[in-house]
């Protein structure tokens, strides 16, 4: 159950906005109440009902929409320097409240982190930006007579990064596996702005499996920026 009485850190929202506007375009930083209200809900049935009733328990203080990895790095530095909670969010199709800013703070909208996918036929993998919509990637592959063979119910309403963050499954998962099987590896940015890559290499018997460490962590440890997935003919 979500705790609605979590104590928030002390910071001045105006100062945070000013700092963020030095990192991203001013229009990418939003504090208008009606927009914040939209970001205080996802597809969780309780949240959907509260939205209809005009109840906004989990309104963030600011929403920022980066368009590059460089901007994400700058945003996370602002958040760390000012002790502002950060909630990474894709398209908000979660049905259990994962993308709600329960401590207020900042929502990091990753839906605009999208670039042309990179296909490797030799490896039968595709690398895509975390903000890319699942159905867009599948359509892009279909034009090349390829498929992910990964079909969560929210395919058209969720992002690639969201799949990793929530350890998603879907139709055909009984045959081809969940995202833990479909994702070969991914790129991440830690809260201290360290960039790391996990997976994407041949099987090894030395050291821990860092890929498993980040699957399903819902942004607690890092922000996902790119995901490499298996493709099939």
Q: For each of these PLM feature ranges, what is it?
A:
Residues 1-77, 93-124:
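N-terminal flexible segment immediately upstream of the FAD-binding catalytic core
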Residues 90-91, 153:
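Short, glycine-/polar-rich solvent-exposed loops and beta-turns at beta-strand/coil boundaries
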Residues 22-23, 81, 143, 217:
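Residues at alpha-helix termini
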Residues 77-78, 180:
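Acidic/histidine-enriched ion/cofactor-binding microenvironments in catalytic or ligand-binding pockets
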Residues 79, 86-88, 141:
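A generic structural signal for well-ordered alpha-helical segments
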Residues 84-85, 147:
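Residue-level detector of anion-binding/catalytic polar loops
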Residues 86, 95-97, 137:
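Extended, hydrophobic alpha-helical segments in both membrane/secreted and soluble proteins
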Residues 115-233:
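FAD-binding subdomain of flavoenzyme oxidoreductases
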């Amino acid at each position: 159950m979500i705790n609605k009485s979590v104590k928030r850190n002390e910071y001045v929202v105006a100062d945070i906005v000013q700092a963020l506007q030095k990192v991203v375009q001013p229009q990418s930083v939003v504090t208008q109440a009606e927009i914040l209200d939209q970001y205080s809900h996802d597809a969780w049935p309780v949240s959907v009902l509260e939205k209809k009733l005009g109840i906004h328990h989990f309104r963030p203080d600011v929403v920022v929409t980066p368009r590059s990895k460089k901007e994400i790095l700058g945003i996370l530095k602002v958040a760390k320097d000012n002790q502002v909670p950060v909630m990474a969010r894709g398209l908000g199709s979660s049905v259990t409240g994962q993308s709600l800013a329960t401590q207020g703070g900042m929502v990091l909208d990753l839906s605009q982190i999208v670039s042309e996918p990179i296909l490797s036929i030799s490896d039968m993998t595709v690398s895509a930006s975390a903000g890319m919509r699942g159905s867009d990637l599948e359509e892009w592959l279909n034009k090349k007579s390829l498929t992910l063979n990964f079909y969560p119910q929210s395919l058209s309403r969720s992002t690639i990064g969201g799949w990793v963050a929530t350890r998603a499954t879907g139709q055909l998962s009984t045959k081809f596996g969940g995202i833990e099987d479909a994702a070969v590896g991914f790129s991440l940015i830690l809260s201290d702005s360290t960039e790391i890559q996990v997976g994407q290499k041949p099987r090894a018997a030395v050291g821990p499996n860092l890929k498993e460490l980040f699957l399903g962590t819902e942004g607690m440890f890092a922000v996902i920026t790119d995901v490499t997935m298996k493709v099939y003919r």
